[in-house]
Amino acid sequence: MSIQHFRVAPIPFFAAFCLPVFAHPETLVKVKDAEDQLGARVGYIELDLNSGKILESFRPEERFPMMSTFKVLLCGAVLSRVDAGQEQLGRRIHYSQNDLVEYSPVTEEHLTDGMTVRELCSAAITMSDNTAANLLLTTIGGPKELTAFLHSMGDHVTRLDRWEPELNEAIPNDERDTTMPAAMATTLRKLLTGELLTLASRQQLIDWMEADKVAGPLLRSALPAGWFIADKSGAGERGSRGIIAALGPDGKPSRIVVIYTTGSQATMDERNRQIAEIGASLIKHW
């Protein structure tokens, strides 16, 4: 479903950390089953986009590695600077071979001509390009400045400490480069619906997420025709996998869903399958 049929609009922000209402416990049963199948921790939360009310949650306040899901927050910070007149999406950034890190399918093709800030955000979100993320991090002042931006939004949980690809290390009990499902869901909701960004910037962020090209095996694989999804996946060491999404029927999003898992010995295909099955249960019991 094209984003042309959906436009973001301001929605008053209410505290999302209310008591959960387990309207469809079948999905939580599937989340717990995924833990058993993967031999790993799984964190899950589902928020109503309009009210911020928690609809379902499992391990919502346990820390998980962010992996590449942080790239949405990063581009939110970039757009905030654009709104403040401190950055321009059309500004071209030049870089060298020495700047390239592993998994940079877009930036490696533009060594001669460079890329605009807009193009870098698109590459970071739609293709999860790691060099694009590092170049964007440089424009805002590095990982600590992204953490400071999140603090300014009221998120004192989510933190970025390192650059790509080291931030994907996912060492157990290491709080670096981590978030909690509840914190991530609330922050994503603020970026997409709150007053932090202008309407144009909110629309741009969700456009990039809707155009995600690397999350096909996850929630997208369970979506019926006509549903809307804008998402960003992540993968890391020690069996870590994650996805953050805004989705809903009738071509527009109505819920925020965040799923993280870490500590599994399972293959990537199996991790993808378990997340897709959680998505299938979510949709079945919508």
Can you say where each PLM-predicted feature lies in the sequence?
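Mid-domain, small-residue-enriched loop/turn segments at the edges of structured enzyme/sensor domains
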Residues: R41, T116, N134-T193
